Amino acid sequence: MDIIGGQHLRQMWDDLADVYGHKTALICESSGGVVNRYSYLELNQEINRTANLFYTLGIRKGDKVALHLDNCPEFIFCWFGLAKIGAIMVPINARLLCEESAWILQNSQACLLVTSAQFYPMYQQIQQEDATQLRHICLTDVALPADDGVSSFTQLKNQQPATLCYAPPLSTDDTAEILFTSGTTSRPKGVVITHYNLRFAGYYSAWQCALRDDDVYLTVMPAFHIDCQCTAAMAAFSAGATFVLVEKYSARAFWGQVQKYRATVTECIPMMIRTLMVQPPSANDQQHRLREVMFYLNLSEQEKDAFCERFGVRLLTSYGMTETIVGIIGDRPGDKRRWPSIGRVGFCYEAEIRDDHNRPLPAGEIGEICIKGIPGKTIFKEYFLNPQATAKVLEADGWLHTGDTGYRDEEDFFYFVDRRCNMIKRGGENVSCVELENIIAAHPKIQDIVVVGIKDSIRDEAIKAFVVLNEGETLSEEEFFRFCEQNMAKFKVPSYLEIRKDLPRNCSGKIIRKNLK
């Protein structure tokens, strides 16, 4: 069955402009408080102008164009402008530094870059090293350096007509994007995402939170990340809703933004929930229109209950990864929710728990979470120019090995245990980092926590805890270890404690454990 009706992204935007016209499609708020609004008609015109800009710079179907941008309207223009002419977007994590960004440019074969002035010096250095195919840079800022091969994105775009000049034949199987994984354990891999993937993601994610055209979906997730693109933006646009894109997350500003824009759906990660909870309570905390808060792993039950009670919201759990495109397991619309379950498998997918020999396990037994989808349609197509890595995780019949451990119950609710690489082997016992982190996070003085395994000559691995304290708090080792001993089995109690000001995170808020080992 063809869920998307054979419609690629160019057709999608032309239809949206016709159907929704002057209805608000996109609101962008910068960190400085500047707000830009676009109707569906205006946004389609900006997308067309951007597509024409790329065409005048020599970009054709199949060419790769990198974006190194924070959340901004230009990201949306470029994303869909490239798709309209069959070119391929390569978003770069805005937190990456020179060597990491150069590596993605090299391995994606990007020939053009759109970025802002704050990142330009880094790319000057990359160009001088002459190790990439990059031949031109467009800067979104008005002020331009006097360099060859650099253009003003805004000036060039505004010179273009609002109708599309170049419209090559497109297929839903065409690649729309190469999205490099966050690489918390190794070098990033380029996840190939098709037009079909993005169109399907829109319909699926809109179904998951029952989006309507009168909804307002607000996110602070980075636009270069799969959550923002496929769970938020594609869902909102596919439903004809209003999409609110905030440049960066601020714990002090976020709830006010939810209220100001009358958001009905938003999404949170644990870091956001924890930092919101340490903000001063307000009598207005429950004065909002939120129907759903999309939530991604992992939170203790105490933290969940406290957040929901204070803000008067409910969490809609969703589990997925870049390779699955969407939250393939999650709470279903109208279905019961069973915390701490991550929900049930969504439509168009199958899910199993498998053992180390790739055999399905019965309910209650822990193994690897495996997902069956259709490559290039409901799950990613492949890793770019990396068939060995693709074959390692994706079977010929569409079964994807997630690398996550979990189990299911008799009613097919699934439960996440941990990343396989986050299991600590301690004296013959397997210890889940997430389990320990959820227990330790309940300590009233602790704001953030991560545990890792470090080498131990006697017991394979020892457990070390890194904690960030709430402002003004102090915590002795004696108090910390006593709390652990009272709340977990003896073999799970950490051997070491380190108190830090912050923890290293990637763009999606996940802690980069390898930086702590």
Swiss-Prot record:
SUPFAM superfamilies in UniProt: Acetyl-CoA synthetase-like (SSF56801)
Catalysed reaction, written as an equation: 4-(trimethylamino)butanoate + ATP + CoA = 4-(trimethylamino)butanoyl-CoA + AMP + diphosphate; crotonobetaine + ATP + CoA = crotonobetainyl-CoA + AMP + diphosphate; (R)-carnitine + ATP + CoA = (R)-carnitinyl-CoA + AMP + diphosphate
GO-annotated biological processes: carnitine metabolic process
Lineage top rank: taxon: Bacteria
Keyword list, A-Z: Ligase
Pathway(s) where this gene product acts: Amine and polyamine metabolism; carnitine metabolism
Database matches in NCBIfam families: PRK08008.1
Protein's name according to its UniProt entry: Crotonobetaine/carnitine--CoA ligase
Organism: Escherichia coli (strain K12)
Classification lineage: Bacteria, Pseudomonadati, Pseudomonadota, Gammaproteobacteria, Enterobacterales
